[in-house]
Regions:
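A solvent-exposed, acidic/Ser-Thr-rich amphipathic alpha-helical stretch
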Residues: 56-107
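Short beta-strand edge/turn micro-motifs at domain boundaries
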Residues: 131-152
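Positively charged n-region of N-terminal signal peptides that target proteins for export
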Residues: 1-4
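A short hydrophobic beta-strand element
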Residues: 109-118
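Short, low-complexity N-terminal intrinsically disordered segments enriched in polar/charged residues
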Residues: 18-53, 57, 61
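Short, surface-exposed coil-to-beta transition loops
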Residues: 98-100, 115, 129-135
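Short, cysteine-centered beta-strand-loop-beta hairpins and adjacent loop/turn segments enriched
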Residues: 93-95, 120-130
């Protein structure tokens, strides 16, 4: 009985893995992003590039004037571009390197949720002294980020 069960599981697994129709369905699903989702992802991609280049002007351009930053679940960290410039402008000036990488992304409508890694060189260029991993949610409306939620 034990061997019969293992044989059934093995055959079922082989059939499932060898079925190209299942692969096509999965890739069709991956390609089925809406224009809104693609546009939201493009904004977040530009944001990550500006962050990594430590280009405060390009970075700030991607945010709405009244952007809100939260720590999950509902703790308001700050609101508005002025506070954003204070916080990130200083960091961009002080750090020798900043590198964020999206390692997994889920997009639904205007919301992009990234599982990200971050590396910072605060003492000398090229020597990473802080690494972190976190999840960030970006809400994008009319090409601007209106809300950011950090999950740590």
């Amino acid at each position: 009985m034990k061997y019969l069960f293992l044989l059934i599981v093995l055959v079922y697994s082989a059939v499932g893995l060898a079925n190209p129709a299942l692969d096509e369905q999965a890739s069709d699903y991956q390609l089925a992003k809406t224009e809104q989702e693609l546009a939201a992802e493009a904004v977040v991609d530009k944001l990550i590039m500006a962050y990594n280049a430590q280009n405060i002007r390009q970075f700030i351009e991607l945010y709405a004037e009244d952007v809100e930053f939260y720590m999950y679940p509902q703790t308001l960290m700050f609101k508005g571009k002025e506070k954003l410039i204070e916080r990130y402008g200083l960091m961009f000036k002080k750090m020798h390197c900043l590198k964020a990488t999206s390692i997994k992304r889920v997009t639904h409508g205007s919301i992009v949720i990234d599982h990200e890694t971050s590396e910072i060189c605060s003492k000398e260029p090229g020597v990473v002294d802080k690494r972190s991993e976190f999840v960030t949610s970006y809400q994008v409306e009319a090409g601007k980020i209106t809300k950011v939620v950090f999950f740590r």
